[in-house]
């Protein structure tokens, strides 16, 4: 499940079935909220839809919002987070190594990735924890803030990055790429009909 936006004023929230490859819920939204996702999942369950698992991005609070359903964080979204923090060509060796490790995520096993992240920390923990002092205020702060953010993002999301391994019988996808592809198709189609009113775009 995910939400895509068409401009700044409106978007579409979609809950998509990876097995039947059809949308179970399509909702016009102005803002993407955890409560709205909860409401839509509950509405589907009330209709008798059995939700075996959920694949979503790492939006704050969303991964923890469904304690009774296996939740897989989209590994592609995790990669985007790391690239946003570290860019394509990090300057420090620690950042280059962490980015390289993150790029193995989609092809790695849970145990191998956790081991790789632990080994990275053992090599670079001192660098990660370096502090600098502000000459004007005298206050200290972490020197490599973006590197810390990237590392802690991986560490924080680890419980949900390999849910598909924990429930092999469910054949859980490890990304929302199927839905992202549908969003891409929608946006390309709407570009061909740029003059349509919003109501017609939703239809």
Label each region the model flagged:
Residues 1-60, 64-68, 157, 178:
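RNase H-like nuclease fold core
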Residues 53-99:
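Conserved beta-strand -> loop -> alpha-helix junction used to position metal-binding or nucleic-acid-contacting
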Residues 49-60, 66, 99-203:
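Acidic/histidine-rich catalytic cores and adjacent linkers
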Residues 17, 32, 92, 194-195:
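A short hydrophobic/aromatic micro-motif that marks alpha-helical segments and, especially, helix-coil
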Residues 18, 41-44, 81, 89, ...:
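Short, charged/polar low-complexity linear motifs in solvent-exposed/disordered segments
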Residues 17, 21, 46, 77, ...:
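Intrinsic structural disorder
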Residues 1, 23-26, 48, 84, ...:
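Residues at structural and domain junctions
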């Amino acid at each position: 499940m995910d939400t895509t936006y068409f401009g700044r004023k409106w978007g579409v929230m979609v809950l998509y079935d990876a097995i039947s490859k059809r949308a179970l819920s399509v909702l016009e939204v102005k803002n993407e909220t955890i409560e709205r996702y909860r409401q839509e999942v509950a509405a589907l369950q009330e209709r008798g839809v059995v939700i075996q698992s959920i694949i979503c991005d790492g939006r704050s609070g969303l991964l923890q919002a469904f304690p009774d359903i296996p939740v897989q964080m989209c590994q592609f979204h995790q990669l985007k987070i790391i690239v946003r923090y570290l860019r394509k060509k990090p300057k420090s060796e620690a950042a280059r190594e962490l980015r390289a490790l993150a790029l193995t995520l989609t092809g790695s096993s849970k145990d191998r990735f956790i081991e790789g992240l632990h080994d990275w920390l053992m090599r670079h923990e001192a660098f990660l924890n370096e502090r600098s002092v502000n000459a004007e205020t005298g206050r200290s702060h972490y020197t490599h803030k973006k590197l810390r953010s990237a590392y802690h993002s991986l560490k924080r999301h680890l419980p949900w990055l390999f849910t598909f391994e924990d429930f092999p019988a469910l054949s859980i996808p490890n990304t929302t790429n199927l839905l992202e592809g549908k969003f891409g198709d929608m946006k390309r189609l709407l570009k061909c009909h740029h003059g349509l009113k919003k109501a017609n775009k939703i239809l």
